[in-house]
Amino acid sequence: MTKHGKRIRGIQETYDLAKSYSLGEAIDILKQCPTVRFDQTVDVSVKLGIDPRKSDQQIRGSVSLPHGTGKVLRILVFAAGDKAAEAIEAGADFVGSDDLVEKIKGGWVDFDVAVATPDMMREVGKLGKVLGPRNLMPTPKAGTVTTDVVKTIAELRKGKIEFKADRAGVCNVGVAKLSFDSAQIKENVEALCAALVKAKPATAKGQYLVNFTISSTMGPGVTVDTRELIAL
């Protein structure tokens, strides 16, 4: 049997695919799976009981994870004048205005998150076809359209992330690294869940957290009992 086959078999022996687990149990399963040679990302996939076709049921927001994501973000800021100087001083990786807009129009997207001052949004809005599908478009709802670029950059460095439901009503979010302590992973997931529950549209009917799966980059997807999460 190949090393890959042995690893898959080892994963399959750690849990029951048909069973739902508590969040703590699910994290333990990920921790017990055969290791790989890099620090895997812990992702969650949440199916929400919404109709994304309705404008009042489109979920998008942000949350500050108590322990960060473990990822070093490449932050881009669209700003000019004093705000650009503030962004540079605050440690943004890329700062500019029309020059960055033109660069991105040419296909460059080598960054993880974009921030913009309100006065830049007329030009930044022209990048919708490039930034939108990559979930990189600054938005007021996510807190990435702001006059306080220093505060926003600091929050992003500390672990503020954006979440958004796709056309199927699913949110996919990276919340931690597998090397984090189990308690840290759990607290990050709980913070995300609390934010999702808070963002529930008033018009959404029936079960809201329909399905919740937690996984690692090379590990299994473990189903979590949503009753525990709704109670957060």
Curated annotation (Swiss-Prot):
One cellular component (GO) term of this entry:
large ribosomal subunit
The alphabetized list of GO BP terms reads:
regulation of translation; translation
Q: Which CDD domains match?
A: Ribosomal_L1 (cd00403)
Database matches in Pfam families: Ribosomal_L1
| Keyword Cell wall biogenesis/degradation listed | no
Question: SUPFAM superfamilies this protein is in?
Answer: Ribosomal protein L1
Q: Tell me the keywords, alphabetical order.
A: Repressor, Ribonucleoprotein, Ribosomal protein, RNA-binding, rRNA-binding, Translation regulation, tRNA-binding
Query: Which GO molecular-function terms appear in the entry?
Result: rRNA binding; structural constituent of ribosome; tRNA binding
Q: What does this protein do?
A: Binds directly to 23S rRNA. The L1 stalk is quite mobile in the ribosome, and is involved in E site tRNA release.
Q: How does it assemble?
A: Part of the 50S ribosomal subunit.
Family, as annotated:
Belongs to the universal ribosomal protein uL1 family.
Query: Cross-referenced HAMAP family, in alphabetical order?
Result: Ribosomal_uL1_B
Q: What is this protein called?
A: Large ribosomal subunit protein uL1
What organism is listed for this UniProt entry?
Chlamydia trachomatis serovar L2 (strain ATCC VR-902B / DSM 19102 / 434/Bu)
